[in-house]
């Protein structure tokens, strides 16, 4: 029973991490959040990979560990499982459901990136206009000494 409970807890933690990964994926459509979201996703992937190694180790530890591994992967008949095993199966289903939602979100990322690219280009254009204005003031002799930077104001 200890192996089964350990598998359930690891799968539950994996589901939580995938849920966080999903939230970070949703942040990829905000220009200002994209770098943070990509870094957060990578950190979550590293944690998930660690959990996968621990789950695989349980599967390799014994015959019952292998059974628990297959239950967590939903590679068995639900009706033939004990109540505790069914709990592991359900957590495994939760992991797969989140993974499916993430795949669907990631299918839309190229479109989101195109929108982000347009937004960034627009920001660059706005900044270029401000730079041109500052250059114009400097050319007129007002940039460093005149109206724009007058210390008395």
Positions of the model-derived regions?
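Heptad-repeat coiled-coil alpha-helices
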Residues: 16, 20-23, 27-30, 50, ...
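Short terminal interaction segments
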Residues: 81-153
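Amphipathic alpha-helical coiled-coil segments
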Residues: 43-59, 90, 95-105
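Intrinsic-disorder/low-complexity regions
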Residues: 51, 73-76, 149
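Proteins with a high burden of low-complexity, intrinsically disordered sequence enriched in S/T/G/P/A and R
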Residues: 1-2, 15, 63-68, 73, ...
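Long, hydrophobic N-terminal alpha-helical segment
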Residues: 1-54
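Heptad-repeat register of long alpha-helical coiled-coils used for dimerization/oligomerization
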Residues: 4, 31, 38, 45, ...
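Carboxylate-rich helix-loop segments that flank metal/cofactor sites and access channels
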Residues: 56, 60-87
């Amino acid at each position: 029973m200890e192996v089964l409970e350990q598998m359930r807890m690891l799968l539950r933690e994996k589901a939580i991490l995938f849920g966080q990964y999903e939230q970070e994926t949703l942040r990829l459509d905000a220009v200002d959040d994209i770098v943070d979201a990509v870094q957060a996703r990578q950190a979550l992937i590293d944690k998930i990979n660690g959990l996968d190694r621990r789950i695989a180790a349980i599967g390799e530890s014994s015959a019952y560990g292998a059974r628990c591994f297959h239950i967590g992967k939903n590679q068995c008949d639900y009706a033939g499982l004990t109540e505790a095993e069914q709990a592991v199966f359900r957590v495994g289903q939760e992991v797969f459901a989140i993974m499916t939602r993430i795949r669907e979100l990631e299918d839309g990322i190229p479109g989101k990136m195109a929108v982000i690219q347009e937004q960034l280009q627009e920001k660059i254009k706005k900044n270029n206009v401000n730079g041109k204005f500052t250059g114009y003031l400097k050319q007129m002799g007002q940039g460093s000494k005149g109206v724009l930077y007058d210390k008395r104001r």
